[in-house]
Amino acid sequence: MSHEAAVLKAKEVASRVLAPSAGQNDKTGRFSTEAVESLGKSGLLGLMLPLEVGGSGLGPHTFATVTATLAEADASVAMVYLMHILGAATIMGARPSAAPTVAPILKEIAAGRHLSTLAFSEAGWPSI
């Protein structure tokens, strides 16, 4: 997938799936499973993963543009997407000895069948 194709796919997901339900999802606190499914089907969940595992092999410029496009339609989904890409990058950065375990996970991510994330906690603050 090229930069242009990724941005076009992000615009399609944003206009067709995100924008119509963003306001209602914000009001009700609903998580948009449809948005994640659309991102997976579009190939955007594997945006920065290497071609060898089925990803698009694209870089930070495309990631930033895609994320901004999603955020214009639904900031919550853009945040989920951001955390997914960072989670996938963390998995990708696993030590080489973990390669037999990591490769199948990366292939699932690139195929749009796995959503990643990260969890953060700050000392002195309760975790939810």
Predicted feature residues:
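Glycine-rich flavin
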Residues: 33-41, 46-128
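N-terminal capping segment at the start of a domain
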Residues: 14-23
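N-terminal hydrophobic or amphipathic helices/low-complexity stretches enriched
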Residues: 1-6, 10
